[in-house]
């Protein structure tokens, strides 16, 4: 068997997320069907992260096995041909060792969340950013984010449907950068809880609106109660950037 590692980008607006689900269109299903159309083989695609409905990806990593060898550049061309008309595409493909696993071999995952902070929305990016019309205090958000760095119990930022065995995670990076009218929040960790990034963003926005003091984030983290944290930020602003191996 030949194992292929692919890098995938997609707009998740009209998709049900990464994972294959009955009755709806997912990124996994689109790619698996495209692979079948050019190879004649039914494969199971394994991704480095399971993005939710509406979440986008710049460099989602996945792998699959084929019994027949194909040149990687031909796989890129074939998948991109058969994924049309969906906005899902393969950017890179390489042959890897059979011990490689897109999910379990990953040592870090990286996300960015985009906030458009201006009085009027974007026609072009309306489903690719979270538009917030009131000015946000970025310096307060940056100060508050420091309480979240490191190894903590992130129960307060965990979805009720999360299947992770432990709420303990290590957030290695949380950078908040203002670029003109956009605020970008960069997250890195070995792994994340379900909705963890979006729940943190929703809480930081409360700080940015001066509804919360920056120091309140520490209390929310320590109480380990989802009800104590802010709302879940919309899926449209979240992007899976890449995974490290």
Curated annotation (Swiss-Prot):
Annotated active site residues, numbered on this chain, are 52 (nucleophile)
Entry's Gene Ontology molecular function annotations: RNA binding; tRNA pseudouridine(38-40) synthase activity
The enzyme class is: isomerase
Coiled coil located at which positions? none
Q: Where does substrate bind?
A: 111
UniProt xrefs under Gene3D superfamilies:
Pseudouridine synthase I, catalytic domain, C-terminal subdomain, Pseudouridine synthase I, catalytic domain, N-terminal subdomain
Q: Any idea which UniProt keywords this protein has?
A: Isomerase, tRNA processing
Entry's EC annotation: 5.4.99.12
Q: Which InterPro entries match?
A: PsdUridine_synth_cat_dom_sf, PsdUridine_synth_TruA, PsdUridine_synth_TruA_a/b_dom, PsdUridine_synth_TruA_C, TruA/RsuA/RluB/E/F_N
Top-level division of the source organism's lineage: Bacteria
Chemical reaction(s) catalysed: uridine(38/39/40) in tRNA = pseudouridine(38/39/40) in tRNA
Q: Which GO terms describe its biological process?
A: tRNA pseudouridine synthesis
| PANTHER family attached to this UniProt entry | PSEUDOURIDYLATE SYNTHASE, TRNA PSEUDOURIDINE SYNTHASE-LIKE 1
* Summary of the function given for this chain in its UniProt record: Formation of pseudouridine at positions 38, 39 and 40 in the anticodon stem and loop of transfer RNAs.
Q: Which family does it belong to?
A: Belongs to the tRNA pseudouridine synthase TruA family.
Subunit structure and binding partners: Homodimer.
Q: Please identify the protein, giving its name as recorded.
A: tRNA pseudouridine synthase A
